[in-house]
Amino acid sequence: MKKVLITGAAGFLGSHLCDRFLAEGFHVVGMDNLITGNINNLSHLFPEKHFEFYHHDVSKFVHVPGDLDYILHFASPASPIDYLKMPIQTMKVGALGTHNLCGLAKAKKARLLIAST
């Protein structure tokens, strides 16, 4: 079974990607720091055998145990209001988060998709 890490998993796009990849037969690892994401977007997935969630900030070192085939990096505050309230956090997720996930992708030999606004 293929395994995918989805960052920003508790956000609008991330939560829908979690749903979709589970429906397609993937093992899904969701990751979110829950600063702007809402855990209720994922609550229906917690009973799923092939879903796991990590409450983690990707601007810090990222570790996911085991193999990893794909990384979808969707973590970021998602609106101009959030950017104004959290400019440093927004830049850290974009720069350090992307750097950390590139390192994870290299270590795991995983394919990486980076979404950005």
Give each language-model segment a name.
Residues 1-117:
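N-terminal Rossmann-like NAD(P)+-binding domain of SDR-like oxidoreductases, especially those catalyzing
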